[in-house]
Amino acid sequence: MGRRTPISNRLSIRRRVSAADVVVGFGVVALLYGITRVGESLSVNVTPGSSTARLPTGLSHLPYYAACSLLRMFVALGFSTAFTFIYATAAARMRRAEMVLIPVLDILQSVPILGFLTFTTIFFFRLFGNVVGLEATCIFAVFTSQAWNMTFSFYHSLTTQPRDLDEAARLYRLTKWQRFWKLDVPSSMIGLVWNAMMSMGGGWFFLTAAEAITISGRNYTLPGMGSYIGIAIRQGSLAKVGIAVVVMIIMVVGVNAVFFRPLVAWAEKFRMEDSASGDKPKSFFLNLLRRTDFARFIGVVTKPIGRFLDRITRPFGLAEYPLAIDKHRQRRGDFAFWILIGVVVAWGANNGLDLSLIHI
């Protein structure tokens, strides 16, 4: 006779699959299906001799257009986050790089977003040769509306870290990789989440220009809410414009409720103030996730990956930035650095002058 499972264990096993698990499971399946469905549009080839400006404007196409726009926004947000981590960390941890990277970032921030489309459109179109190039152009335009603000926020958080946290990282002999994920990112999380939310909101305004692109006198319109609104405006259909605006409002509210609101509530645990905030943000969706095994499942899957990355990044050394700096050695290094920058600038100016003379 086989050994029977205790009643308490059987009940705990039954409780593992709850209504929250079912809801989150259906949500994940729907998300994967939506990404797959939207990704099918990347197989459509676009040539300079054709025009894709005539998108169907029936109301039945609005869910598909909304999914396309959402996917572009989140892909751009992912690239913006990766750029923020790399660029801001380099500027905050390398003093000489900071003298170049921060002014360059300030210049990029002052360039109008639509100005990037003038030279990136042809570049991406020739690089990929089909609709992927147009998608890359659109995503890059949205990226420029998000990345600069997020990078400045992360850079400011890194340069204003409390000294006791730096001493704790030295005491525990964290590697540079470990310090980044266990100290730098958590201590900057609140500001990064809020700036990502603001940057995401600003990106919605540029969808119309980013999804409708002109190349060699031809108009190429990618499926999305921005292009739908642009076509409806050209057709003079105020009803379609109004419906599209309502759909976009629903999209913005939904993204806030399902994505940013949970992130804001979750990021509160990284707050380092002595006095707790009186009105802590709450999220129904975050509470729903906490009642499931989804977070535990993600942890089980990613923990081996994290351990592997810890091992392969150990050769980069410990995060022990020098406390005392030799001023004479620093001045010699600065002198050599600026000579190198001058040589690069002179080389670039000379090549630019040669190209202009050739065109003349």
Residue map of PLM features:
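N-terminal, non-cleaved signal-anchor transmembrane helix
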Residues: 1-78, 245-358
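Alpha-helical transmembrane segments of multi-pass membrane proteins
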Residues: 67-72, 76, 105-109, 159, ...
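Transmembrane-helix boundary motif in ABC transporter permease subunits
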Residues: 76-105
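Generic hydrophobic transmembrane alpha-helix motif, especially the helices
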Residues: 106-145
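Membrane-cytosol interface at the C-terminal ends of specific transmembrane alpha-helices
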Residues: 132-199
